[in-house]
Design a protein with these regions (language model features):
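Feature of Fe-S/electron-transfer and energy-metabolism proteins
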Residues: 110-132, 136, 289-291, 295-298, ...
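Basic (Lys/Arg-enriched) interaction patch that binds polyanionic ligands
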Residues: 281-314, 513, 517-520, 529-548
């Protein structure tokens, strides 16, 4: 493994120390480094727990505040690319070490308390010895589908029979509903007796052990802490379940992976459905409709981040890590590599389970990664959307790659990659610079990475500031060398989160229902005349305007546009107002008023041989006045008697 300490020290480290076995014979070097006040980076993760334990013990003794960062350079930039130049390897190592020094933002979390109340769901009494043993440490209730013929009550567990109907919640807060539920009569003699049955019996518990169901009772079982399932288990599985259940007692921190801001959510308005991208993307089924917005079940959420990558309004934000920090890491990796190697790297997004292990195996048993491929680890690659891919290219990488894992939802990655491809189609950048790699073996991974290097791209001066939509606009503008003024349009497909709308002027009555329903403020009207305007930069193609329009006059037009006009109000449809025949004040829509008059005048008994048609031509104030003084006004009384004067009496 090549490791140039002097070259790396020139890249910003105060001191670079090389060892052969940091976790073994050279462990004293690790202790010495951690026993100081300066921040430390260990370029080895194999014995991370050892180093973290040493740091913890030293901090307890001396109250040290030095931070410890760990990164495995061996798998990523050591045992790799045997034909790579010394300069390339050093550049890659410097980039990874610079990334390791970045201060990671903390993930918000909430406390989850489990007191050890455990529910066991089983077929028959064969599970009772397991319940007896587990009940020595947990508060156990065992619910059997088949009541036992004879069994003695136990002080270690409660026994009941029933069939589970539903289960909701997570660790420390499961809500369970049973049918045919019946509890053991503990005072009976002879055959086992149970009390009266009850449907819809409700209960709560902290831990659920399911020994019955072949399929999970809960959606997203893998993300539900506290739900342990093993249908028809053998003794070894029961022992494992027992150990896991006992470890689920106490207070835990549950990460809150996403934040939700309902005020800018484009899901629904007035019972009309608009954007459903997050609901469609969530493989854990943790998101559901909730009035005008959505509800995210944090107990079900596994933190994949797919919802945030497709949310067009940033109503859902991913916090592990935030998008802004992800971009900071991208810029750090690429700028450090380019500065040292004078060439552009490829960024490979991998997850911390499948992808990381595949890279480690490739490094240990084969050629490993090419010298220009820098792995970027995330918890789940589903959080990588079109904005992240474009940010990589905008920061100066030669390619943005995603390594799929078996647990990755295929549609989420495919849709975002396809959207990126469509956006790049309107630029001068080669669309092959973005790719999704499906590799189940070392050979497939290396086949996809070796021999496919692209020439260094043109360097773009992109700030990469703001959220996903802002970064996307900046990168595409740089790639098209847009002057900021000239209109430019890139055709997209239905469902893409950029575009405008078209209004059929023959159908539209300018009722402005669409304006009132637009969740992003992209649609607006004017105070002086009937008119619909759009700010295209704010349109997310949620479809609420089209679904709300009573005349079906609106059609979505997906496109990505650049230019000053996308930030300004652009008229879609407008007409002159009708002028009141009494006071001249403009009101309503001229064509609508004229159409009403055409359909009523002389064709309806209330508008035949009367002046009622004139009322339609009046503004609201003049109409009230005219009706009040009309001779046929329903509240009109008889004519007021003439006032009699003295002269009247004298004349009489």
């Amino acid at each position: 493994m090549q490791f140039d300490a002097d070259a790396l020290q020139q890249r910003g480290f105060d001191q670079v120390i090389t060892t052969d076995q940091l976790c073994g014979s050279d462990l004293d070097v690790a202790v010495s480094a951690l026993n100081q006040t300066q921040d430390v980076v260990f370029a080895c993760e194999q014995q991370a727990q050892v180093f973290e334990q040493i740091q913890y013990e030293l901090s307890q003794e001396d109250q040290l505040n030095a931070s410890l960062s760990l990164i495995d350079l061996r798998d990523r930039a050591g045992w790799s690319a045997p034909d790579a130049s010394h300069r390339e390897i050093t550049a890659k190592q410097a980039a990874l070490l610079a990334d390791a020094q970045l201060e990671r933002p903390g993930t918000p979390a909430r406390e989850v308390t489990s007191n050890g109340t455990c529910l066991i769901i089983a077929h028959d009494a064969s599970v009772l010895p397991f319940a007896e043993q587990l009940g020595e440490e947990l508060a156990v209730t065992c619910v059997l589908e088949q009541p036992p013929v004879t069994t003695a009550p136990s002080s270690n567990y409660d026994l009941a029979t029933g069939k589970i109907r539903s289960i909701q919640g997570g660790l420390g807060a499961f809500d369970v509903i049973f049918d045919r539920f019946s509890t053991l009569t503990v005072s009976g003699r002879g055959a086992t007796q149970f009390g009266p049955t009850q449907d819809g019996a409700e209960s709560t518990c902290d831990i659920v052990i399911d020994l019955v169901n072949e399929t999970s009772l809960l959606a997203a079982e893998a993300t539900r802490d506290g739900y342990l399932r093993a249908p028809n288990p053998h003794p070894i599985e029961l022992a494992t379940l027992s150990a896991r259940a006992k470890g689920l007692v106490g207070t835990f921190d549950k990460p809150l992976y996403v934040r939700y801001e309902g005020s800018i959510c484009a899901h629904s308005r007035s019972q009309q459905t608009g954007c459903t991208r997050c609901i469609d993307t969530c493989g854990a089924k943790a998101i559901r409709s909730n009035g005008d917005g959505v509800y995210i079940d944090q107990d079900m959420c596994g933190g994949c981040g797919g919802c945030a990558s497709v949310c067009p309004t940033s109503a859902i934000l991913y916090d592990d890590p935030p998008f802004e920090f992800l971009v900071t890491r991208v810029k750090t990796l690429i700028s450090t590599y380019r500065g040292a190697a004078n060439s552009a790297p490829r960024i490979l997004f991998v997850d911390r389970s499948f992808g990381k292990q595949l890279i480690a195996n490739a490094a240990r048993f084969s050629r490993g990664l090419p010298a220009d491929v820098i792995p970027y680890e995330v918890d789940n690659v589903e959080l990588i959307g079109h904005a992240e891919l474009l940010a990589v290219l905008g920061a100066g990488a030669s390619a943005a790659l995603i390594l799929k894992s078996p647990r990755t939802a295929k549609t989420a990655i495919a849709n975002q990659s396809a959207l990126t491809d469509r956006l790049l189609s309107g630029t001068t950048v080669d669309r092959q610079r973005v790719a999704v790699i499906e590799a189940d073996s070392i050979e497939q991974l290396e086949s996809a990475l070796y021999g496919t290097a692209l020439p260094d791209p043109k360097s773009f001066d992109v700030a990469l500031l703001g959220g996903r939509r802002e970064v996307t606009k900046q990168v595409i503008a740089a790639m098209t060398e847009h002057d900021g003024e000239t209109p430019l349009h890139i055709a997209l497909e239905p469902g893409d989160p950029y575009g405008t709308i078209e209004v059929d002027s023959d159908k539209c009555t300018l009722c402005l229902a669409c304006v009132s329903q637009c969740p992003t403020g992209a649609l607006n009207d004017r105070s002086d005349r009937p008119e619909i305007n759009i700010v295209e930069n704010a349109c997310v193609q949620c479809g609420l305007c089209a679904n709300t329009c009573p005349e079906t006059a609106i059609t979505l037009k997906p496109q990505f546009s650049l230019g000053k006009q996308t930030l300004d109000q652009q008229p879609l449809h407008g007409e002159d107002p009708f002028e009141c025949i009494e006071c001249g004040r403009p009101f309503g829509v001229k064509s609508t008023i004229e159409k009403i008059i055409e359909k009523l005048d002389g064709k309806h008994w209330m508008y035949t041989d009367s002046d009622n048609t004139r009322l339609v031509k009046m503004c609201d104030d003049c109409r009230v006045s005219a009706q009040y003084h009309d001779e046929n006004a329903p509240m009109r009384g008889p004519d007021r008697p003439r006032v009699r004067t003295t002269d009247d009496y004298l004349d009489s």
